[in-house]
């Protein structure tokens, strides 16, 4: 509701929210079969009379795994501020209705980094014939665009990249480099993670929701242990988080 109110109060505000195409069209928990998140977006759009405005919610048909399993991380760009978190924007994480779930947040204020992420969204996601509005009643069925989805994923895996002249330097202790990777072959993100394993001097700390590492990483961990390096693995626990 807050997003729609903000758009209603300030029509010139640019709002684009990208969500998993498949998950957004599943049934809401405990709701009848016809009710999905996408249906709710349409209802809210009609409620706040935004019919003539650009769409706010878009579905991205990518549901694949990264090197450490499914990476449930969310990215937000507010003007020149980038916010990364494992949390969703919902009542539980915002401590509404007497419930609160803790998560981690990284807040980075840097105009070039924010611009590079917005440019990536515009160039590689919104500029596609399969990243479609979810707050529209005229949504195609997934099977109708399946061939286009395969082409989209292949093209994104081959060409997707952030356009930033150099890493964002925040002093001696922190440098931020946006990397994109999709799929198994030539995945820059996965390759970079594996290469970092080779640079450990004393200790490696891994934060991961899963413990089933790919075989290549298992081999690298064994190699580090044989060389006497310390390895700390922090595994997410749902009960503890809740």
Kindly give the residue locations of the regions a language model identified.
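Charged, low-complexity intrinsically disordered terminal segments
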Residues: 1-40, 50-53, 57, 61-74, ...
């Amino acid at each position: 509701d807050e997003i729609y109110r903000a758009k209603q109060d300030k029509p010139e505000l640019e709002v684009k929210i990208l969500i998993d195409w498949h998950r957004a069209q599943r049934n809401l928990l405990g709701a009848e079969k016809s009710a999905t998140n996408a249906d709710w977006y349409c209802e809210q759009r009609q409620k706040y009379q935004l019919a003539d405005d650009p769409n706010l919610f878009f579905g991205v048909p990518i549901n694949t795994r990264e090197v450490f399993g499914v990476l449930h991380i969310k990215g937000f760009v507010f003007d020149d501020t980038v916010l990364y978190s494992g949390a969703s924007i919902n009542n539980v994480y915002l401590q509404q209705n007497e419930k609160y779930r803790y998560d981690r947040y990284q807040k980075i204020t840097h105009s070039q980094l924010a611009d590079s992420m917005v440019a990536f969204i515009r160039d590689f996601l919104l500029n596609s014939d399969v990243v479609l509005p979810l707050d529209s009643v005229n949504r195609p069925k997934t099977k109708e665009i399946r061939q286009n989805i395969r082409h989209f994923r292949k093209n994104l895996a081959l060409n997707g990249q952030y356009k930033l002249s150099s890493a964002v330097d925040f002093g001696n202790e922190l440098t931020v480099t946006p990397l994109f990777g999709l799929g198994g072959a030539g995945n820059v993100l996965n390759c970079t993670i594996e290469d970092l394993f080779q640079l450990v001097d004393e200790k490696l700390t891994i934060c991961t929701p899963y413990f089933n590492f790919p075989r290549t990483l298992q081999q690298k961990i064994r190699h580090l242990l044989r060389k006497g390096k310390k390895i700390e693995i922090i595994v997410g626990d749902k009960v503890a988080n809740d």
